[in-house]
């Protein structure tokens, strides 16, 4: 992936690129002329996406790096893969993550710690590892959080808390890195029809009210996320309804908001107390 003069080619690293918002972000970045490094666990899906991007007219085939970001040494392995391909980090898209729905005392503790590991520690480690190269390139970082970052989430407690971390971390980075001319944006989508809901045990089928009205496609979320990043917007919330939800949540007393959020999550854990991981990794 080196350039004609032998220099390392700058790439946009997209984690959780195998499906959903991550795959759509990869498509948008490719369509806007960025070379890519696609990261997720499922090599077959990444290869298929890379083939699709080439078929759509990309000059350079995306680098495919299949790994689990929670495994020891995974980020070192990603850095080595970039180096071996003659690539360097210019943009980092931290999209990989997953959620679990249910009461915290009825969920598998190991799965809950794995959620923190991916949603918080891996995102932070990726940022710290590739930040020197991104600063040198005056590049950009897009962290994918959720409107969950703005409110507590009964029956989704740890997931919501991890997204609050992502938002706070991103906003602080925006200020810290402004002198370096590095753009940092936090993308905060609401409900999106992807595999997330089915695998988390929280499906939107049959639901009414704000959750349904706020529904937006993964492709539109990705487009707005990219445009917001390029425009230097600190926080990007796709959809008017999602922005209204955040506004209302920010003004309601917590004593009113908590039962409303519990009702929105149905107030019911899964029958066996365990929910499969909702993953974009």
Give residue ranges: language-model regions.
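Active-site helix of classical SDR
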Residues: 127, 162
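SDR active-site lid
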Residues: 179-242, 255, 272-281
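Residue(s) in the substrate-gating loop at a strand-loop-helix junction
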Residues: 146
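Substrate-binding pocket helix/loop in short-chain dehydrogenase/reductase
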Residues: 103-104, 108-114
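Conserved glycine-rich cofactor-binding loop
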Residues: 18-19
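Conserved glycine-rich Rossmann-like NAD(P)H-binding loop of the short-chain dehydrogenase/reductase
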Residues: 32-49
């Amino acid at each position: 992936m080196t350039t004609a003069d032998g220099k390392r080619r700058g790439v946009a690293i997209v984690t959780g690129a195998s499906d959903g918002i991550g795959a759509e972000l990869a498509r948008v970045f490719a369509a806007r002329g960025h070379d890519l490094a696609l990261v997720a666990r499922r090599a077959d899906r990444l290869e298929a996406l890379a083939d699709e991007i080439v078929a759509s007219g990309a000059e350079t085939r995306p680098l495919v790096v299949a790994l689990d970001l929670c495994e020891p040494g995974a980020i070192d392995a990603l850095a080595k893969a970039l180096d071996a391909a003659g690539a360097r980090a210019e943009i980092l898209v931290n999209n990989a993550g997953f959620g679990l729905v249910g009461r915290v005392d009825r969920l598998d503790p190991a799965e809950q710690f794995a959620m923190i590991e991916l949603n918080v520690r891996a995102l932070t480690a990726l940022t710290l590892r590739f930040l020197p190269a991104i600063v040198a390139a005056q590049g950009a970082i897009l962290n994918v959080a959720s409107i969950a970052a703005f409110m507590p989430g009964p029956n989704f407690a740890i997931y919501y808390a991890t997204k609050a971390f992502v938002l706070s971390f991103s906003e602080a980075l925006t200020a810290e890195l402004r002198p370096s001319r590095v753009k940092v944006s936090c993308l905060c989508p609401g409900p999106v029809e992807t595999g997330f809901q089915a695998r988390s045990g929280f499906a939107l089928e049959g639901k009414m009210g704000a959750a349904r009205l706020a529904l937006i496609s993964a492709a539109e979320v990705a487009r707005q996320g990219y445009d917001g990043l390029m425009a230097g917007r600190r926080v990007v919330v796709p959809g008017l309804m999602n922005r209204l939800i955040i506004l209302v949540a920010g003004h309601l007393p917590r004593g009113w908001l908590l039962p409303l959020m519990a009702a929105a999550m149905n107030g019911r854990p899964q029958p066996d107390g365990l929910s499969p991981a909702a993953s974009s990794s």
